[in-house]
From Swiss-Prot:
Residues reported in the UniProt entry to bind Mg(2+): 175, 332, 334
Protein name in the entry: Glucose 1,6-bisphosphate synthase
Localisation per UniProt entry: Cytoplasm, Cytosol
Active site location: 175
E.C. numbers: 2.7.1.106
Biological process, per Gene Ontology: glucose metabolic process
Gene Ontology cellular component annotations, sorted alphabetically: cytosol
Gene for this chain: PGM2L1
Its biological purpose: Glucose 1,6-bisphosphate synthase using 1,3-bisphosphoglycerate as a phosphate donor and a series of 1-phosphate sugars, including glucose 1-phosphate, mannose 1-phosphate, ribose 1-phosphate and deoxyribose 1-phosphate, as acceptors. In vitro, also exhibits very low phosphopentomutase and phosphoglucomutase activity which are most probably not physiologically relevant.
Associated disorder: Neurodevelopmental disorder with hypotonia, dysmorphic facies, and skin abnormalities: An autosomal recessive neurodevelopmental disorder characterized by severe developmental and speech delay, dysmorphic facial features, ear anomalies, high arched palate, strabismus, hypotonia, and keratosis pilaris. Early obesity and seizures may be present in affected individuals.
Sites of Phosphoserine modification: 175
Main location: cytoplasm
Residues annotated as binding alpha-D-glucose 1,6-bisphosphate: 73, 175, 336-337, 434, 436, 448
One Pfam family from the record: PGM_PMM_II
Length: 622
């Protein structure tokens, strides 16, 4: 009898009109329960409804995801602002509608879908399942789909889009985010991530296609449709072949006595890094056994982000000591970023920052270009790029060596987009990076790539070893030649969007309305650039050269003492990040003095501009 009552209750819940007192919420509840065919996420909403948890229902159902610096990204679970079966179907329907409008040959060229190894039992949600549903929506509309038959590194998707001449592609991943998250990363036909206006237009199309179409839930199409193709072997072979373009010392690599440890952080990277090492002539790197295989719980690390440093590299470093390996390489879970560490003579580990690795990459890629360039190659056609919050070291190298350096807004989508423009104009791009350990060596992939970066660092270390030089020693040589660049990057957590907004609005109206600060503590400010509003005091017309980015907060201060500091919000996480760098000329070699000056300025920046105690900000814990 009790079972029948429960059944009746569920039946009534499913079909009754909802009277929460909020018409918008009532409509959203009805839509969710009609459209969602995933029993677990449907049950999550039903339970909230049954328990009268209207605030949480409103939070989950009365807003939608927007495109950040890496596409759509959110927690997995039930709701229109979460990543789940229904929202991925809706997103893909919007993609289909937009692509059909943009490409008359969409149904000839097709679409690429890849995925990482994330998953969540409570919502029956995994990257693989979401990839299958993405494919199903398109297959049901007679679009050829290149669906990878197993997990792949994120860079394989943009690479495949280019090589297969597809109109676009999607990678289901949340990269290095916490285990609860997942994402939907979109690449255009060029192989670069989408930028405006495509992101806004796709969102409009998603909002016009929220009700699942007939066939959108039919993931059996992945097994039965003749339009489904598996590009894995072909793309892996071609990717590894293209890696040879940035391998310059294969014979030397094959003879090196250096040993390398690699960790894939419970993600996709192991097999692909092993293959890349083989292409470069190396013996296989030693894998960290506890982290080699996919694990969506990331059970051996407190967070799956190698950027967090020594605290998350513990297993790798201990294994390297045991195996007498001097260099540790860590790819993040979707293998698009790379961290590196080197054992020093004093027995301590040097974990390189993204900016320090970029200094080494910049030196290496230009040095290899000089030694291997064709007779008529002109240095004036050579470019390197970085995001505006990253170190200015490439700018210093470019000024001395004669090549071009350019900055973009944060996010590799801007770098990829600019590289396309440069390549179309006959320019050569050697290297690009963002300080958050994202590196691009060569232009086979127009996105950051941890697999290629890992093997390039190995070759660099192997080459330097023949001259008895360590990576750390070479970094010092780079700074001695081009000028010391001492940087610090960190963040505060803030879960209250109104607080974040008020912090930045205060800076825009500091001493009086529409007046930015002229000092930070005792440090005089020369220039202010605010790309959120498009203001730049260093320009004659006071307008920022970088594109306006109204969807995120970002203000950069240039100080009289040569320091550049930026405050910005994260596009993927609830963080306020700060970036600060002292840029010195080569004759300023007192690093202790530079570091002390930088520390004082950062302390002033935090105390005067962020005010963590007053604003309830949570300090980064490492």
């Amino acid at each position: 009898m009790a079972e029948n009552t429960e059944g009746d209750l569920n039946s009534n819940l499913l079909h009754a009109p909802y009277h929460t007192g909020d018409p918008q919420l009532d409509t959203a509840i009805g839509q969710w329960l009609r459209w969602d065919k995933n029993p677990k996420t449907k049950e999550q909403i039903e339970n909230l409804l049954r328990n009268g948890m209207n605030k949480e229902l409103r939070d989950r159902l009365c807003c939608r995801m927007t495109f950040g610096t890496a596409g759509l990204r959110s927690a997995m679970g039930a709701g229109f602002c979460y990543i789940n079966d229904l929202t991925v179907i809706q997103s893909t329907q919007g993609m289909y509608k937009y692509l059909e409008r943009c490409f008359s040959d969409f149904k000839q060229r097709g679409f690429v879908v890849g995925y990482d190894t994330r998953g969540q039992v409570t919502s029956s949600c995994s990257s693989q399942r979401l990839a299958k549903l993405t494919a199903a929506v398109l297959l049901a509309k007679d679009v050829p789909v290149y669906l990878f038959s197993r997990y792949v590194p994120t860079p394989f998707v943009p690479y495949a889009v280019q090589k297969l001449k597809a109109v676009a592609g999607v990678m289901i991943t949340a990269s290095h985010n916490r285990k609860e998250d997942n994402g939907y990363k979109v690449y255009w036909e060029t192989g670069a991530q989408i930028t405006s206006p495509h992101d806004k237009e796709i969102l409009k199309c998603i909002e016009e296609c929220v009700e699942p179409w007939n066939g959108s839930w039919n993931d059996n199409l992945v097994d039965t449709s003749p339009l489904k193709r598996d590009p894995l072997q072909d793309i892996c072979r071609r990717y590894m072949e293209d890696l040879k373009k940035i391998c310059f010392y294969r014979e030397l690599n094959s003879k090196t006595t250096l040993k390398f440890v690699h960790t894939s952080f419970h993600g996709v990277g192991h097999d692909y890094v092993q293959l890349a090492f083989k292409v470069f002539g190396f013996k296989p790197p030693i894998p960290v056994p506890e982290q080699k295989d996919p694990d969506p719980d990331f059970s051996t690390v407190k967070c799956p982000n190698p950027e967090e440093g020594e605290s998350v590299l513990e297993l790798s470093l201990r294994l390297a000591e045991k195996e007498n390996a001097r260099v540790v390489l860590a790819t993040d879970p979707d293998a698009d970023r790379l961290a590196a560490a080197e054992l020093q003579e004093n027995g301590c580990w040097k974990v390189f920052t993204g900016n320090e690795l970029a200094a080494l990459f910049g030196w290496w890629m230009f040095d290899c270009w000089k030694k291997n360039k064709s007779r008529n190659a002109d240095v004036k056609n050579v470019y390197m790029l970085a995001t505006t919050v990253s170190s200015k070291i490439l700018k210093a190298i470019a000024l001395k060596e004669g090549f071009h350096f350019e900055e973009t807004l944060p996010g590799f989508k801007w770098i990829g987009s600019r590289i396309i423009d440069l390549l179309e104009n006959g320019k050569e791009v050697l290297f690009a990076f963002e300080e958050s350990i994202g590196f691009l060596c060569g232009t086979s992939v127009l996105d950051k790539d941890g697999v290629s970066a890992a093997v390039v660092v190995a070759e660099m270390a192997s080459y330097l070893e023949t001259m008895n030089i360590t990576l750390k020693q070479q970094l010092v040589k780079v700074y001695e030649k081009y000028g010391y660049h001492i940087s610090k990057t960190s963040y505060f957590l803030c879960y209250e969007p109104p607080t974040i907004k008020s912090i930045f609005e205060r800076l825009r109206n500091f001493d009086s309305p529409k007046e930015y600060p002229k000092f930070c503590g005792t440090f005089a400010i020369l220039h202010v650039r605010d790309v959120t509003t498009g203001y730049d005091s260093s320009q004659p017309n006071k307008k920022s050269v970088l594109p306006v980015s109204k969807n995120s907060q970002m203000i950069t201060f240039t100080f009289q003492n040569g320091c550049v500091a930026t405050l910005r919000t994260s596009g993927t996480e609830p963080k306020i990040k700060y970036y600060a760098e002292m840029c010195a000329s080569p004759d300023q070699s007192d690093t202790a003095l530079l570091e002390e000056e930088l520390k004082k300025l950062i302390d002033a920046l935090i105390e005067n501009f962020l005010q963590p105690s007053k604003n309830g900000l949570i300090w980064r814990s490492v």
